[in-house]
Amino acid sequence: MSMSTRELGGSLPVENVQQLAAASHNFKDIPNRYIRPELDNHVVVDESLQIPIIDMTKLCSDEQSKGCLDHQELEKLHQACKHWGFFQLINHGAAQVIEEMKVVSEEFFKLPLQEKMKCGQLPNNIEGYGQAFVVSEDQKLDWGDMLFLMSLPVSLRNMRFWPNSPPHFRPTLHNYSKELHKIAMRLFSMMAINLGIEPQKLTSAYEDCNQGIRMNYYPPCVHADKVIGLTPHSDATGLTLLIQINQVQGLQIKKDAKWVPIQPISGAIIVNIGDVLEIMSNGEYSSIEHRAVINFEKERLSVAAFHNPNMTTDIGPLPDLVKTSGEKYKRLSHQEYIKLVVASKLDGKSLLDHMKITH
């Protein structure tokens, strides 16, 4: 059972930010919808903290086995998921497809606007080139453009939104999608072991998962401190795997009421726990609020791969994890949950708060 992206709703059309940035030379050139006086710039940015680094070669060689090569690394993964919600994954075996994805991402965003708009968003559709989560005409906007594509299952791919230019874009994204799903499945297996359940209890929900790929372009801004690339939020997904294209710093996570900049490691995949995995783990693992800030002089590019359970899986705590403490989160059908996500604007962890059971 699947659900077309047209059934989910969409995002309202807005001005192209890359073009807007090229024409903005001072503060008055920036439309008011992008100025964010509510930004919590008073919150301390702590550059001394760093998210954990996980070496995938030290995790289990056999996804179905509990005989791990390095129990210490497995515990390190567990603590990262519990207390950080973010980690950088190294030695993951996907270096080649990542480099190829970086090339086509940069080439796509360098195309003339007219060419990029050939795969522009359509009314009531979340896919395509534009902006996401714009649900009202008076909503404040993010300083960035994106291309969002459904990549898995293959039956959900709408090739109308898959660029023909650059010419090697489609096969590159196909290979990238496949390899990142393999990595996500291995991580889900390790997480299940850490949660004390059989891997299949978690991985079965993601074997035919819904995977979406979002390519992000954040242009520089003459008043970078007055705009935001991506509004503070937690991901509404199960697991997000992100690569930073040009190593320009901009991703920050909120840890202990402080914003922590993520220092990009060349070739690493940044992994973060989404709201769905927090719900499925019954709160054992935590999604975390994060944002993208803008650079005064340099553009920043990234590619995020979002992994959600298949559409037959209800969104709720796994039965094996509620025996002692009871369910801490509501249970929705996947269709109900996705409709809730698409109808919501990015706003901290408000979506997850909606799912919590209050006594």
Residue spans of the language-model regions?
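Peripheral, non-catalytic segments flanking oxidoreductase cores
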Residues: 1-359
